């Protein structure tokens, strides 16, 4: 009887802890990403795609990612409330446009140089705005 009770108690605790753990792993309103975080993740994804596709000479894919980055940053930059953030975001947009043009011409050297400039601009923005907080 005592062994049965202990087994049922252990099984019950296991089931309850599993349910509680599973419930905690679901995203809540407090853990959802803010719109700016979603935008930054998209930008990071496009940068990763370009850095992956450029060495393999997939220029069409590089141009596609650069165009997406350019249009998203242009739209965000026009309404950015911080003047420095606005300037840096629009700079990323113009560099991404130049990257797309270079990729369209299959000019890997220029595209790589522009990607390096985009990364430097991102780092500058993070240092002066995001990480400053």
Please tell me what each predicted stretch does.
Residues 15-18, 22:
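N-terminal signal peptide c-region/cleavage motif recognized by signal peptidases
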Residues 10-14:
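Short, linear, compositionally biased motifs with a strong N-terminal bias
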Residues 118-130:
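The canonical Cys-X-X-Cys-His
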Residues 22-119:
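Extracytoplasmic c-type cytochrome modules immediately beyond a signal peptide or single-pass transmembrane anchor
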Residues 2-3, 43, 130:
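Basic side chains
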Residues 1-9:
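Bacterial N-terminal signal peptides that target proteins for export
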Residues 133:
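Short Cys/His-rich "knuckle" micro-motifs
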């Amino acid at each position: 009887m005592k062994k049965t009770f202990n087994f049922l108690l252990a099984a019950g605790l296991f089931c309850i802890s599993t349910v509680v753990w599973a419930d905690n792993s679901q995203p809540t309103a407090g853990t959802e990403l803010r719109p700016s975080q979603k935008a930054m993740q998209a930008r990071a994804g496009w940068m990763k795609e370009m850095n992956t596709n450029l060495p393999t000479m997939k220029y069409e894919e590089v141009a596609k990612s650069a165009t997406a980055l350019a249009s998203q940053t242009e739209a965000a930059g026009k309404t950015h409330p911080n003047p420095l953030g606005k300037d840096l975001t629009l700079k990323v947009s113009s560099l991404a446009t130049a990257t797309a043009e270079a990729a369209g011409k299959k000019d890997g050297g220029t595209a790589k140089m522009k990607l390096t400039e985009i990364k430097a601009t991102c780092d500058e923005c993070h240092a002066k705005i995001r990480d400053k907080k």
